[in-house]
């Protein structure tokens, strides 16, 4: 029997409610270096900690998608905008306190720029 290739995982950066929801869904994992694939952001979390976690998740080869609350992505917008690799994909998601605003999603805006609206008529 052939062994299955190891799959890639999600990473989550968000408020406690968002991250706990995903952890309850089974996405929490520690890598070989005992580093988690999530960061809970609260009032005491610094922008530097958020940016380090984001860059760390981008550098990991076991992560395929990074989910980040949009209001937290705004705090490190320069880092999110500088990420141009397709993997890991970065998806901005709403939180309980901050609804999703498509106009602030730089990745969505970049994707819109790839297509001509006339192509969809």
From Swiss-Prot:
InterPro entries: ATPase_V1-cplx_f_g_su, ATPase_V1-cplx_fsu_euk, ATPase_V1_fsu_sf. Disulfide bonds: none annotated. The keyword Glycoprotein does not apply. It comes from Caenorhabditis elegans. One of its GO terms (molecular function) is proton-transporting ATPase activity, rotational mechanism. This is Probable V-type proton ATPase subunit F. One of its GO terms (cellular component) is proton-transporting V-type ATPase, V1 domain. Gene3D superfamilies: ATPase, V1 complex, subunit F (3.40.50.10580). SUPFAM superfamilies: AtpF-like. It holds the Pfam family ATP-synt_F. The lineage of its organism: Eukaryota, Metazoa, Ecdysozoa, Nematoda, Chromadorea.
């Amino acid at each position: 029997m052939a062994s299955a290739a190891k799959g890639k995982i999600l990473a989550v950066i968000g408020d406690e409610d968002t991250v706990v929801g995903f952890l309850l869904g089974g996405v929490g994992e520690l890598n070989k270096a005992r580093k988690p694939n999530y960061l809970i952001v609260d009032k005491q979390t610094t922008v530097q900690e958020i940016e380090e976690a984001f860059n760390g998740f981008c550098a990991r080869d076991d992560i395929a998608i990074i989910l980040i609350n949009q209001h937290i992505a705004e705090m490190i917008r320069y880092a999110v905008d500088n990420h141009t690799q397709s993997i890991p994909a970065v998806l901005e998601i709403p939180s309980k306190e901050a609804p999703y605003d498509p106009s602030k999603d730089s990745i969505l805006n970049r994707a819109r720029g790839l297509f001509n609206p006339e192509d969809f008529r």
